[in-house]
From Swiss-Prot:
GO terms for cellular component: plasma membrane
Family: Belongs to the PufX family.
Keyword Zinc: no
One biological process term in Gene Ontology: photosynthesis
Pfam families, sorted: RhodobacterPufX
Gene3D superfamilies from the UniProt entry: rhodobacter sphaeroides pufx membrane protein (1.20.5.920)
Keyword Nucleotide-binding part of the UniProt annotation: no
Protein name: Intrinsic membrane protein PufX
Function comment: Associated with the reaction center - light-harvesting complex I. May play a critical role in facilitating the interaction between this complex and other components required for light-driven cyclic electron transfer.
Keywords tagged on the record: Cell membrane, Membrane, Photosynthesis
InterPro entries: Intrinsic_membrane_PufX
Amino acid sequence: MADKTIFNDHLNTNPKTNLRLWVAFQMMKGAGWAGGVFFGTLLLIGFFRVVGRMLPIQENQAPAPNITGALETGIELIKHLV
């Protein structure tokens, strides 16, 4: 009976042991996926930080946005129509 262990008798294991092994495998598989997603996200954030630091520092040369520009355009359109 001493030669009967889980390692050399894996085909005739107890159903309870099979369930425990399956649950443990599923948990390890889920932990692997979670770790992969977590570290993948960290790598992506790090990549964007490196690319952002390589870009030149320049001020925006465009003029400030005109918030009332749409209203002025609408008023001019109404004046042309009337």
